[in-house]
Amino acid sequence: MVGFTNLILLLQPEKKTLIMKAIWTILLLIVSNVFMTFAWYGHLKLQEMKISSSWPLIAVILFSWAVAFFEYCAQVPANRIGFIDNGGPFNLMQLKVIQEVISLTVFTLVAMVMFKGQSLQWNHIAAFFCLIMAVFFVFLK
């Protein structure tokens, strides 16, 4: 069986470059969204753990901004690498829909691990299906 890496090596150089740019874009968006989720919701876990309960709101905001800095350190390169006008494989709409699917997937995984009381309901699964269909439709020509 031919491995994924070997399959990429068999492709034409320009296709290989596009595939690698797509992979890097998606990996960087995953990293970005992990930081984004912690920036947006990590302070709630810190409050639950009694670490930040006494912090003033401005300290919580500054903490979240500090975490979000690392989100942008991954998100900006992801969009630059992946954008078609920069030689990437994705147009602007495709980048946005991919980012939203990654964002909600990462959020769901983090929420289920960090906040044990959260559960996945049928309507959440239906919403994820709609997102997958959004990805399908945005890639149609």
What label would you give each PLM region?
Residues F4-I19:
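Short, Lys/Arg-enriched N-terminal segments with co-localized hydrophobic residues
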